[in-house]
C-alpha cells in the first residue's frame, strides 16, 4: 500500500496500488482462509526491497545497488531521481534487505513448523537512495552522483517511503538480526566485481 496506515500485516494497511500488488494480496487472503485448519505449515513472507547475489536475470527489476554498480562501470557515475512530493534529491527511502538475511528468515520458519501466517520480511529500518549511491561510490573510491528529473509517468504512482513493521516477525522469535547496509553494499559490490554477482564454488 501507500504506507499511510503503516506497513504492518494488518488489513488496514493492505491497499494494493497496482494489479501486481492486488494479485499478491488476493493470494494472501486466499491463504488466510486455511491457516487455522491446515495440516501443513503455511507461511507467507512479504519481501521488501531485496538485494544481493544472483539477481542478474531480473534486468530492470534488479535491485538499485545492482543497477548503480553497473551504471558506475559504464559511465563512472550513479544517477538518482531529483526530489518530489516533499522529498529532497535522492532522499526517497526503502526498506532494503540483504538476500542473506532473507535466507535466514526463511530458515527460521523452516526450523519452527509450529508457526503460521503472513509476515513482513524487511529490516524495519528505511534507508535513502542516497545512502545506497554513496555506498557504491565509496566502494569504487571515485565517481559522480547525478540527479535526474523525476519522471512524469511516475508521479502519483511512486512509493517514496517503505519501512517494514517487523514486530510480528520479532515477536515470533526471529533473532537472526540484519546485516548493516554499508557492510552489505561493500560485500555485494565486491562480489559483483569478482564474479559478476554470482556465487561460485571455487573449491
Regions found by a protein language model. Give the residues of each.
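Catalytic helix-loop patch of NAD(P)-dependent Rossmann-fold dehydrogenases
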Residues: 1-44, 56, 60
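Short secondary-structure boundary/capping segments
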Residues: 10-11, 69-70, 110
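Gly/Ser/Thr-rich beta-alpha loop segments that engage phosphate groups in nucleotides
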Residues: 3, 23, 54, 90-92, ...
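C-terminal substrate-binding subdomain of Rossmann-fold SDR/epimerase-dehydratase oxidoreductases
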Residues: 72-203
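Active-site beta-alpha turn of Rossmann-fold NAD(P)-dependent dehydrogenases/reductases
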Residues: 17, 46-48, 122
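Conserved sequence/active-site signature of Rossmann-fold short-chain dehydrogenase/reductase
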Residues: 50-52, 102
